[in-house]
Curated annotation (Swiss-Prot):
Organism: Bacillus subtilis (strain 168)
Places the protein is found: Secreted, Cell wall
Signal peptide: 1-28
UniProt KW Secreted keyword: yes
Protein origin, superkingdom: Bacteria
Protein name: Cell wall-binding protein YqgA
Length: 142
């Protein structure tokens, strides 16, 4: 009888472990806060949905945000680039005060990764004030 109760206990413990155990998920990447020169206290950053993109990933999802001390900023060249290689894929422009809409950069519309790091980022401006933020990412070869 003790062996039966012990087996039930082990099965319940295993089930609980599977339910409670954290699932592996992609960790968001951030450029960290970058100052915008010419606007006191203004900082921006770019966030992507991961640092490393596996072969099964279909897109890079990214947005930019301010620390709330910038007012309305214009942005240009929000896109993906190969580090030391230039822009690839679509480049977006617009304006934002707190956060840009999330941009999706589909791997099907980008060159095949070769192992060279990529960057996702944008340039901002407001009058003569300027700034930029970039996240370095690692897309796996496809």
């Amino acid at each position: 009888m003790k062996q039966g109760k012990f087996s039930v206990f082990l099965i319940l413990l295993l089930m609980l472990t599977l339910v409670v155990a954290p699932k592996e998920k992609a960790e968001a990447a951030s450029s960290g806060w970058q100052p915008v020169s010419g606007i006191s206290g203004c900082k921006i950053r770019v966030i992507t949905d991961a640092y490393t993109y596996t072969k099964s990933a279909t897109s890079i999802d990214a947005y930019a945000e301010t620390n709330g001390k910038c007012g309305k900023l214009n942005y240009k060249s929000f896109g993906v680039s190969i580090v030391e290689g230039g822009d690839i894929g679509p480049q977006y422009s617009g304006y934002f005060s707190s956060r840009t809409p999330t941009k999706k950069f589909y791997f099907s519309k980008l060159p095949k990764p070769t192992g060279t790091p990529w960057a996702v980022g944008l340039s901002v401006y407001k009058g003569k004030a300027k700034g930029a933020a970039f996240v370095y990412i690692n897309p796996q070869k496809r």
